[in-house]
Curated annotation (Swiss-Prot):
Required for maturation of 30S ribosomal subunits. Keywords: Cytoplasm, Ribosome biogenesis. GO terms for cellular component: cytosol. This is Ribosome maturation factor RimP. Disulfide bonds: none annotated. It comes from Polaromonas sp. (strain JS666 / ATCC BAA-500). Signal peptide: none annotated. InterPro entries: Ribosome_maturation_RimP (IPR003728), RimP_C (IPR028998), RimP_C_sf (IPR036847), RimP_N (IPR028989), RimP_N_sf (IPR035956). GO terms for biological process: ribosomal small subunit assembly; translation.
Length: 200
């Protein structure tokens, strides 16, 4: 059995989701795990989860005779990679960084302030209308710089218009959650249509 399959079966068998497997120089085998997605529940990987998976993988990889010198099991962190449709569904509405396989081109940038050579974007991930029967996504952003603490903003100044770029998963080279650090605490994710009477 291939190493990828062995690791995936072991991780999912323990009740976790395999996010990424990486082999680096020096024989390091890095395995990234996460909690399976459950709508409405926000769960996080902790040290005990990583330890549990590490112990099981060490046993399984020894039995399989896998060639590695060090094993590292960790959570995906604040810049979690988005790899498949399920990941995009899970993190819709979140701030993401995407890199396209090819620049958007002159046709796509016509009539907008976006450069035709641009491949990298940061914005809010949203579901879009399907294109040719393929599930569509879009990223929405504003090129207005963020307001700095203590900075005064004129009430007369018009905000920069929102821009959107539609894409399919086949056009993505890399997508990750944007690492946003807020030391004032985690803000609850606003769900459209949620019952506002329960908020007090």
């Amino acid at each position: 059995m291939a190493l990828q399959e062995t690791i995936e079966q072991t991780v999912t068998g323990l009740g976790y989701e395999l996010v990424e497997i990486e082999r680096t120089g020096g024989g390091l085998l890095r395995v990234t795990i996460d909690m399976p997605y459950v709508s409405g529940a926000e769960q996080f990987i902790n040290a005990e989860d990583c330890e549990k998976v590490t112990r099981q993988l060490q046993f399984v990889l020894e039995v399989e005779g896998a060639d590695y010198s060090r094993l590292e099991v960790s959570s995906p962190g604040i810049d979690r990679p988005l790899r498949n449709e399920k990941d995009f569904e899970r993190f819709a509405g979140e701030l993401v960084d995407i890199t396209l396989k090819a620049p958007i081109g002159v046709a796509a940038s016509a009539g907008s302030a976006v450069s035709a050579n641009r491949k990298k974007f940061r914005g809010t991930l949203e579901r879009a209308a399907p294109k040719d029967g393929v599930a569509g996504w879009q990223i929405v952003w504003s090129d207005e710089p963020p307001v700095k603490p203590g900075q005064k903003v004129s009430k007369k100044k018009l905000p920069a218009p929102l821009q959107a770029l539609g894409f399919t998963l086949d056009e993505i080279h890399q997508a990750r959650l944007a690492p946003v650090v807020d030391f004032k605490g985690r803000k609850p994710k606003i769900v459209p249509g949620a019952d506002k009477s329960s908020e007090k």
